[in-house]
Amino acid sequence: MRAVVQRIKEGKVTVEGEITGECNFGLLVYLGVGREDTVEDAKYLAEKIVNLRIFEDQEEKLNLSVKDVGGSLLVISQFTLFGDCRKGRRPSFSEAAKPDEADYLYQEFVRCCNDVGMTVGTGVFQAHMMVHAINDGPVTMLIDSKKTF
């Protein structure tokens, strides 16, 4: 499971002009599910992200998590995080999970975040979404549950 995590001042996602999720302050998480991912990957990544210390403390050091600062999450499914661009010019998505399994693990990730008290806004799985965000910093992290980077 892979995530691109961005610290944001605000964000929202719309599908066909309707807001489906929003975050007034916190983290925008683009989440990709790989074909070998399990519930354990969802749990690991949720715990890692909600406790990741990428918010500044009083000394302007990155010492606080989204939980510490009372922020929320906006989680967007994005299978393209498993796009392999090493050969040719068209990405291969063969390492991405099948839609049914990806949706299940995406929902499991959201549930794990909710279980630790996080407010989570979401997009719509497999929908064409418009994501609007005001990045803060910017601070952007790449996280992989298999620890490949």
Swiss-Prot record:
GO terms for cellular component: cytoplasm. It comes from the Bacteria. It catalyses: glycyl-tRNA(Ala) + H2O = tRNA(Ala) + glycine + H(+); a D-aminoacyl-tRNA + H2O = a tRNA + a D-alpha-amino acid + H(+). Its EC number is 3.1.1.96. It is an enzyme of class 3 (hydrolase). CDD domains: Dtyr_deacylase. It holds the Pfam family Tyr_Deacylase. Keywords: Cytoplasm, Hydrolase, RNA-binding, tRNA-binding. A motif (Gly-cisPro motif, important for rejection of L-amino acids) lies at residues 137-138. It is found in: Cytoplasm. One of its GO terms (molecular function) is D-tyrosyl-tRNA(Tyr) deacylase activity. The keyword Hydrolase applies. Coiled coil: none annotated. One of its GO terms (biological process) is D-amino acid catabolic process. A Gly-cisPro motif from one monomer fits into the active site of the other monomer to allow specific chiral rejection of L-amino acids. Belongs to the DTD family. An aminoacyl-tRNA editing enzyme that deacylates mischarged D-aminoacyl-tRNAs. Also deacylates mischarged glycyl-tRNA(Ala), protecting cells against glycine mischarging by AlaRS. Acts via tRNA-based rather than protein-based catalysis; rejects L-amino acids rather than detecting D-amino acids in the active site. By recycling D-aminoacyl-tRNA to D-amino acids and free tRNA molecules, this enzyme counteracts the toxicity associated with the formation of D-aminoacyl-tRNA entities in vivo and helps enforce protein L-homochirality. HAMAP family: Deacylase_Dtd (MF_00518). Homodimer. This is D-aminoacyl-tRNA deacylase.
